[in-house]
Amino acid sequence: MAETTKIFESHLVKQALKDSVLKLYPVYMIKNPIMFVVEVGMLLALGLTIYPDLFHQESVSRLYVFSIFIILLLTLVFANFSEALAEGRGKAQANALRQTQTEMKARRIKQDGSYEMIDASDLKKGHIVRVATGEQIPNDGKVIKGLATVDESAITGESAPVIKESGGDFDNVIGGTSVASDWLEVEITSEPGHSFLDKMIGLVEGATRKKTPNEIALFTLLMTLTIIFLVVILTMYPLAKFLNFNLSIAMLIALAVCLIPTTIGGLLSAIGIAGMDRVTQFNILAKSGRSVETCGDVNVLILDKTGTITYGNRMADAFIPVKSSSFERLVKAAYESSIADDTPEGRSIVKLAYKQHIDLPQEVGEYIPFTAETRMSGVKFTTREVYKGAPNSMVKRVKEAGGHIPVDLDALVKGVSKKGGTPLVVLEDNEILGVIYLKDVIKDGLVERFRELREMGIETVMCTGDNELTAATIAKEAGVDRFVAECKPEDKINVIREEQAKGHIVAMTGDGTNDAPALAEANVGLAMNSGTMSAKEAANLIDLDSNPTKLMEVVLIGKQLLMTRGSLTTFSIANDIAKYFAILPAMFMAAMPAMNHLNIMHLHSPESAVLSALIFNALIIVLLIPIAMKGVKFKGASTQTILMKNMLVYGLGGMIVPFIGIKLIDLIIQLFV
């Protein structure tokens, strides 16, 4: 999954060429009415080639009509090729995933505790299996016993094994992954054919892909333009009769194909599929094309501080006692409150305490773990208790117990916060001893990324459980626009609703069960693959690498998808207008000499003018395939700036390029006439 696929790999091109011919079947082509019009024109040209008197008025040579047939055929093949190539890349990724679904046996645990070996395909929801070192997990499940490291690289591309154990947020395992060490007992949670891997394959292959609202709106516009141009073409026949100008049916067919928006009509499906593919190349699964497209409309990002903006492993940097306590007493209490704390922060406090060369206590007590509600952790001994935690929570505890708050505590807490650190207050028996300074490190490159997002009109909001000062310092250092301090997971849904009430499109990341409501509420929810099943079901995007920073990448991909579609649509419509004014003067100058003044290109003849435009129309589809597949490149700028730039490049370019291309092709045709 993590490996990217080159656009024009030989095996993909060969398969795409075969598929592009198979897609000529009319039942398939009618799904794209614009290209179906081209196919009808191609069949009429073929009929006129075989039976020149089909309409009792054909005035051009059979070779000329056959040339039109061949060019129209190539136009259809090129349009189908772009779609087939985009689909082929998805199928290649799906085949890579399918390789992990090799036939395997499963060790099912029967009710009497004995084992039986059965085919993994025979496993049902609720069955319990035992998986040991080196064995593959046969299907999606939930760990009910044991602790093991699991290698998920076959699914996620991430080489580092992850720890799975019963209980908590990390007890879900994916079928197709393998146990790297120890053993697990797993309760199967999905029926055969409905596993996470099966869903991934379906998503990657695009089997469930439907047109997005923007695609439907654009398609409606293109169909309207097609009908308008067809009506214009139909009126030309009686007009030519009135002017005593013999306008052949073959030329009318060619002119119709030149003027309707075949360029974007042939590339529209490929653009959407390629957009999904670019997301997949980042190891992100999109549940629908709509979710990727919505990313392009996002203007507010809700970001967690820990793990997204900072590296997440805050390290103890200093012990700062209050005036009424001593340094040694603070170190001992901090050590005792952290000795059983297995978090990175807890381990760093113990490590820093050892460096102080103080005789540390060895008394054993009952560990009180940190919770989102209490926001503190510590140890209860027989005659006393020590805690460390968020300043507000600790002060509240002391006040409720009738204790004394040191006068210099507030200054110490603010001092740590102003440095961008996180202060933890330490107390013993409701007596505050001092502050632990936890250092937070901003991830590299985020300042520039946030600046780029700001220039594009995207606002970043940092949500953190830290106090106001710490949050403000980190927000300023990272360059986020706003922050929400002392924010609990359940508070995020309120932040999202507030932004949506302002008319904003909101995106957020999450991995826990408590994030699921907010992920479902957000317009774009990116769940971590390492997270809970409820979070992954609530989100519309899943990051297989479990890297929350990727939310920013997905938003940029979504914007690129919309820009690519808009840019190529602008280019296509500008092309049609340019071809209209390039061809018509050359066609009618014999019947209407005044039209010769408009024939600024001085094309050789009406026949060569139409043929040149038709060839250009086919070639431009091929030339635009790389842009449709890779997307339009852009740098951070406001929407208005990007729009003006694209109008200049693709609008003006779309007007100029046809004049140049058609003239060059006309000159080449003259060499063979």
UniProtKB/Swiss-Prot annotation:
Signal peptide positions on this chain: none
Keywords: ATP-binding, Cell membrane, Ion transport, Magnesium, Membrane, Metal-binding, Nucleotide-binding, Phosphoprotein, Potassium, Potassium transport, Translocase, Transmembrane, Transmembrane helix, Transport
Amino acids binding ATP: D341, E345, F370, T371, A372, E373, T374, R375, M376, S377, K388
SUPFAM superfamilies membership: Calcium ATPase, transduction domain A, Calcium ATPase, transmembrane domain M, HAD-like
Binding, Mg(2+): D511, D515
EC supergroup of this enzyme: translocase
EC numbers: 7.2.2.6
Protein origin, superkingdom: Bacteria
Database matches in InterPro entries: ATPase_P-typ_cyto_dom_N, ATPase_P-typ_P_site, ATPase_P-typ_TM_dom_sf, ATPase_P-typ_transduc_dom_A_sf, HAD-like_sf, HAD_sf, P-type_ATPase_bsu_IA, P_typ_ATPase
Disulfide bonds: none
Transmembrane segments: 34-54, 65-85, 216-236, 253-273, 581-601, 609-629, 649-669
Subcellular location field: Cell membrane; Membrane raft
Recorded catalytic activity of this chain's protein: K(+)(out) + ATP + H2O = K(+)(in) + ADP + phosphate + H(+)
GO molecular function, one term: ATP binding
Topological type in the membrane: Multi-pass membrane protein
Active-site residues, Swiss-Prot/TrEMBL: D304
Subunit structure: The system is composed of three essential subunits: KdpA, KdpB and KdpC.
Similarity-based family: Belongs to the cation transport ATPase (P-type) (TC 3.A.3) family. Type IA subfamily.
Protein name stated in the entry: Potassium-transporting ATPase ATP-binding subunit 1
Gene name of the encoded protein: kdpB1
